[in-house]
């Protein structure tokens, strides 16, 4: 696009190319002269790629019967444990189905059509569900490893969105750390989920919106919270759009003060750290000064506050003002909850297409697959390769791979 740097796909290395097609002119294309000289210059190159015809390798395992004269019985050699665990679909096909179900948001009907039209095989939707459940079992250990790690994190962003299970209302919670993201589906949207996942002694900073569950968790267990300033801005813009002139002016002053703080943040790379820290603290103090000073107020004959919106905003800052500025002194946490909201977007898309789950196994499968897909995206890893490695380890009764990158 105009004004944007040009991006070109890097050329395939020569070692990866299987077929070369050379073209040479026998005569000049303009005048027809046959006396042409080949130049010692590299050729123009146009590269292509194509998928081979999908060939399904079919295998058969045979166990022959033997008759034992001692016990008078027929015996068969046991099949290898990995073969029994695999069933009809071996590890790569199992990983592919799980990948399509999660990354591609494909329904079982869509996957069945893929198997029919591309692989020329027929399977039922029920069998495909069992295949995905095998992949889910393979991902249990990596998921549990992250679940146990969450209470130890120094900074977490949390959000929640609705989820349907058998027509019932559930909630998908997202916990985003620096190196990974974890999804948990629960019946409740209350603080109990935070308590179950993070415990009573969570010592990090929790980035979240202003929802009541976070308030309760914060107050019950003295948790440090960074409330989302983006949500705060939306509420302040509502004040600035009200018909009451004093309330509107109050909202506009608050917006201007917050805008000044974000201007400081945007110039972070141009400012030395001590000066940046001082500028942030000054911007914070100015916001609190505006929020708590000159708050419009008018009481009716019964002593009830008539400018309720401004009153509630000022009370929010009195009670929780500090929780909007933890990012100033806490590395790894930002002023907004955008990280968690971004992580949950593909789950919302999946919900729209697949229409939710139908029981505990389905919820567990979604939790684990979403966690793998989201974490691999953060780390620049292939979700398919991770699912394949986990499935392979599961079938072979080997330790599962980890979603935590090796450090050091």
What are these regions (language model features)?
Residues 1-85, 158, 208:
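Short, flexible loop/hinge motifs at secondary-structure junctions
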Residues 3, 118-122, 130-217, 224:
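RNase H-like nuclease fold core
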Residues 28, 68, 97, 111, ...:
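Mobile genetic element proteins and their domesticated derivatives, centered on retroelements
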Residues 35, 52-154, 373-375:
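Short, positively charged, Gly/Tyr-enriched micro-motifs
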Residues 37-40, 76-79, 165-167, 183-185, ...:
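Short helix/loop capping segments that flank catalytic or ligand/cofactor-binding pockets
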Residues 67, 100-107, 169-182, 229-232, ...:
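Short conserved beta-strand segments at catalytic cores or DNA/RNA-binding microdomains
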Residues 210, 219-253:
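Conserved beta-strand -> loop -> alpha-helix junction used to position metal-binding or nucleic-acid-contacting
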Residues 211-213, 252-408:
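Acidic/histidine-rich catalytic cores and adjacent linkers
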């Amino acid at each position: 696009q105009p004004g944007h740097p040009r991006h070109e796909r890097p050329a395939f290395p020569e070692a990866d190319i299987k077929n070369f097609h050379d073209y040479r002119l026998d005569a000049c294309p303009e005048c027809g002269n046959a006396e042409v000289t080949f130049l010692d210059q590299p050729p123009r190159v146009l590269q292509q790629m194509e998928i081979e015809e999908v060939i399904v390798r079919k295998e058969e395992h045979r166990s022959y019967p033997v008759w034992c004269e001692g016990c008078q019985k027929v015996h068969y050699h046991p099949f290898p444990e990995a073969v029994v665990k695999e069933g009809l679909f071996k590890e790569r096909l199992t990983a592919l189905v799980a990948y399509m179900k999660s990354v591609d948001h494909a329904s079982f009907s869509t996957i069945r059509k893929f198997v029919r039209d591309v692989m020329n095989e027929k399977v039922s939707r029920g069998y495909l569900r069992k295949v995905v459940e095998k992949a889910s079992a393979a991902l249990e250990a990596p998921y549990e490893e992250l679940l146990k790690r969450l209470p130890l994190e120094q900074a977490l962003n949390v959000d929640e969105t609705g989820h349907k299970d058998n027509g019932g209302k559930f909630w998908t919670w997202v916990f985003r750390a620096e190196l990974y993201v974890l999804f948990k589906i629960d019946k409740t949207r209350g603080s109990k989920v935070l308590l179950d996942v993070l415990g009573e002694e969570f010592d990090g900073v929790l980035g979240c919106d202003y929802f009541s569950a976070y308030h309760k968790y914060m107050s019950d267990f003295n948790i440090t919270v960074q409330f989302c300033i983006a949500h705060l801005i939306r509420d302040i813009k509502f004040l600035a759009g009200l018909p009451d002139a004093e309330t509107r002016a109050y909202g506009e002053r608050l917006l201007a003060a917050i805008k000044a703080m974000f201007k400081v943040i945007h110039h972070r790379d141009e400012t030395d750290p001590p000066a940046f820290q001082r500028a942030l603290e000054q911007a914070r103090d100015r916001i609190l000064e505006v929020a708590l000073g000159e708050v419009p107020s008018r009481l009716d004959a019964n002593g009830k506050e008539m400018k309720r919106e401004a009153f509630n905003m000022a009370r929010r800052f009195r009670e929780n003002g500090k929780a909007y500025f933890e990012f100033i002194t806490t590395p790894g946490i930002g002023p907004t909850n955008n990280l968690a909201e971004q992580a949950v977007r593909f789950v919302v898309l999946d919900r729209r297409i697949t229409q939710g789950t139908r029981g505990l196994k389905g919820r567990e499968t979604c939790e684990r697959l979403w966690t793998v897909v989201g974490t691999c995206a953060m780390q620049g890893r292939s979700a398919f390769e991770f699912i394949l490695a986990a499935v392979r380890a599961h079938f072979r009764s080997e330790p599962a791979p980890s979603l935590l990158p090796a450090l050091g």
